[in-house]
Regions:
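Hydrophobic alpha-helical hairpins/lids featuring a short glycine-rich hinge
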Residues: 1-7
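Metal-coordinating catalytic core of metallo-dependent amide/deamination hydrolases
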Residues: 7-137
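Alpha-helical segments flanking ligand/cofactor-binding loops in enzyme cores
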Residues: 19, 83, 119, 144-145, ...
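Divalent metal-coordination and catalytic microenvironments
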Residues: 21, 69, 98, 133, ...
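Glycine-enriched alpha-helix->loop->beta-strand junction motifs that scaffold or abut catalytic
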Residues: 25-27, 88-94, 126-129, 146-155, ...
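Short, acidic/turn-prone active-site loops that include or flank metal/cofactor-
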Residues: 34-35, 101, 158-163, 186-188
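His/Asp/Glu-enriched, well-ordered alpha-helical/loop segment
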Residues: 123-126, 130, 172-255
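A conserved active-site cap/scaffold subdomain adjacent to cofactor or substrate pockets
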Residues: 140-142, 146-184
């Protein structure tokens, strides 16, 4: 799942990425990051790129590509742009957006819209079983309940949150609520086992509890990610059984002793 942004090369960027992934045999779900930061013309072009690619992916029968309607974050997207994205979103896909990654995102939403971020997304029709929210650091229990009610997905990006000094999300509570949660990177690393390790120690440190995260982190990586992908691809993923997709990686194992 890639949330791409390159504001000097919007048109056809998702198609270029998908072709490279195809050459490598990698299954991909792509979207372009819509934002008002570079003006309305660029925002509109971003919406159109998402729509074009999503329709192309929906018509493809290889089960190797999928598309979403990508958005940057609440504080960089006006109601006008939200409405434009919703009007051009094909049926059968959802949104991919950063949510409450920084406290500024929450403050902006409260000041300009008089509501918290998840409430705004709910009112704009963004939430749902096909929508993926990144981060969710500054959300409260009421917002978690909305995510559960709408069956919206969440992805935790521990190294990105630490590197950007954003804070630690209430991921253990989110998982406890039964919200489908995956483990990601936000582009900070390409090593998922490193993300696994960092997520494990981050929540132990943050909660001052050495028993925290032992079950939740492997659940996110080995079960949550496959279930998230399963909402966009037809074949069974994340399992070793007859008929399932053979999405297998083989890693070197360095023995601790000679």
């Amino acid at each position: 799942f890639d949330h791409h942004a390159s504001f000097y090369r919007i048109s056809d960027s998702l198609f270029t990425i998908s072709e490279a992934a195809k050459d490598l045999g990698i299954r991909t779900c792509l979207c372009y990051e819509i934002s008002d930061r570079d003006g309305m013309e660029k925002a509109r072009e971003s919406v159109m790129e998402n729509e074009r690619f999503a329709r192309y992916a929906l018509a493809d029968d290889s089960d190797m590509i999928a598309g979403m309607m990508g958005m940057h974050a609440s504080f960089t997207i006006s109601n006008e742009t939200m409405e434009l994205a919703a009007a051009h979103k094909p049926d059968g896909i959802g949104y991919h957006i950063h949510v409450a990654e920084g406290i500024e995102d929450l403050h902006h939403c409260l000041k300009h819209y008089g509501k918290r971020i998840v409430d705004r997304l709910m009112d704009c029709g963004i939430l749902g079983e096909k929508t993926l929210l990144g981060h969710c650091i500054y959300i409260n229990e009421h917002e978690m309940d909305l995510l559960k009610e709408t069956d919206t997905m969440v992805v935790h990006n521990p190294e990105s949150n630490m590197g950007n000094a954003c804070g630690c999300p209430p991921t253990m509570k989110i998982v406890e609520k039964g919200i489908l949660t995956g483990l990601g990177t936000d582009g900070y690393t390409h090593d998922m086992l490193e993300s696994y390790k960092v997520a494990n120690v981050l929540h132990k440190h943050h909660l001052c509890d050495p028993n925290a995260a032992w079950g939740e982190v492997p659940q996110m990586l080995f079960e949550g990610n496959a279930k998230i992908a399963g909402r966009y691809f037809k074949k069974d993923l994340g399992v070793l059984r007859e008929g399932a997709a053979a999405d297998v990686i083989v890693m070197d194992y360095d023995l601790l002793t000679p």
